[in-house]
Amino acid sequence: MSSSIFGPLTGFLERVNSLNAPYQALSYDEQKAMTIWQRVKFYNWTFELCALGVLFLVYAFYKFGNSVNLKRGNQIFQSLHSFLANDLKFSRVGFNINDSKIFTVEHQNTWFSSFATGRSAIKSINLNLHLVARSNPFSMCLEYLLGFFFASLKSKQLEEFMEIVIRPNGILVTSESAHPNKNAHEILTKFRFVTSIVNKEFMNQARTENYFLSIAHTSENDKLPNNFVYMSDVNQLSGFMFHYSKPYEVLSQAGNLLKYISFTDLPVNPPRDDKEWESSIEPKAIIRCAVPQNENELKLLNQIISLVVEIYDGFTQDLVQQSPNLFITNDILKRTTNLRQQELNKIKKFMKETELELAKEKKLELEKAKRRQLKASGQQEKVDQKMKEKRERRLKNKQRTRFQ
């Protein structure tokens, strides 16, 4: 077995050494008599040149992969920033535009991030782009092969996606001279629900990866294109998006791009305790989609973002102005609140069970430690004898009581 593994390697090393067999055959005096230029000409540099060639290829792949990711990131964020600033009228978009740092780049040009803020009804928009690390094609190919043959070993770093998180602020400003409403906190309490439009192909993965979708109910409707379904914690919420916008045309074109749009106040990861539950409750809309590949898909992504902003505009306006056409009724909010309380009770129950298990384990460890100490001091036999006598007395008392 070892010869079959190391045999080719040994043969390769021998061939490398044989490249300079004539030079190594020279005696010390012969090498000493040669000038530096003569040694350079006589020496076989094949192996060194091949090594330099490999290093150059690695560096070239690294630079090329990084440049490809950076070019795609620039193209996507320039389109998004222009749309957010000019069409949706956000007052601040991106980072330092003067230094051309309109987005941040991390992890060898694989994670791109930016934001927008300063607008009525919207607190902020976070833009996140993840691309495959093209700087190391050998590692990328190996991970693809492992993921293809062993699904459990598939790396999440191989998935390319775009995620946009839009957070409302509960503030309505209809004009530059208008005063904002002062009950923003109260308005935001009306955003506590989950309603989503999810691509059927991504539905199972979405449930697995997102806690807020794992507790949602699935339903279909003629208003949706065939490749999308509703996922909401209350069935009446399915019409929420259509009440404040007309998304059918955009959705019918976004079958290959959009994975889901979700309005939620619940976190992505399941809370482990009640404190984490309370701290993670935050109203937001999450858009998850594939990475746009061309100008048409970039325009489509901009339209999807515009739909969500339009929905938040309309919903916030109805809440602030107490419109009779308000879609989210007190009955719906009561039902969503009850569902959240049920989920919180499950978490608390799990916490108590976990604490009891830990207490039992700790008690068992203490008893074992105590027994080891008694055994080491020679007192264990006396303790066992006392326990035995105690059990016998209890048994006799029970028998005596029974006969009486």
Swiss-Prot record:
Topology relative to the membrane: Single-pass membrane protein
Gene Ontology MF terms in the entry: calcium ion binding
Keyword check for Transmembrane: yes
Keyword terms, alphabetized: Acetylation, Endoplasmic reticulum, Glycoprotein, Membrane, Transmembrane, Transmembrane helix
Region of interest: Disordered: 369-404
Biased composition (Basic residues): 393-404
Any one of the GO CC terms: endoplasmic reticulum
Keyword match Kinase: no
Biased composition (Basic and acidic residues): 381-392
Pfam families found in the cross-reference section: CCDC47 (PF07946)
Modification sites for N-acetylserine: 2
Taxonomic superkingdom: Eukaryota
Protein's UniProt name: UPF0674 endoplasmic reticulum membrane protein YNR021W
Native species: Saccharomyces cerevisiae (strain ATCC 204508 / S288c)
